[in-house]
Amino acid sequence: MRQCMDMDNLHNRLKRVDGQIKAIDRMIEQDVPCEDIIIQINAAKTALHKIGHVVLEGHLNHCVKDGIEHGDAEKTIADFAKAVEYFSRL
């Protein structure tokens, strides 16, 4: 799995999301208006969705490609379909 992802990119994205979540927590403590908190929650959600997109793209470009070329194509496609289904629920 490591070879199909840009680990540094993913770690940096996750650190940013972590910072966003901590900022949301501080906003709640500071009694910031609800609308502003919702905006930040949406930003964190969007960032997580993008991380999922990056992971799914890496999975397709490496794991799925390798599974089709060197493994069981039917199982690989079925597993990828499940991954896409999970991603679509984000």
Regions found by a protein language model. Give the residues of each.
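Solvent-exposed interaction patches of small proteins and small membrane subunits
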Residues: 1-90
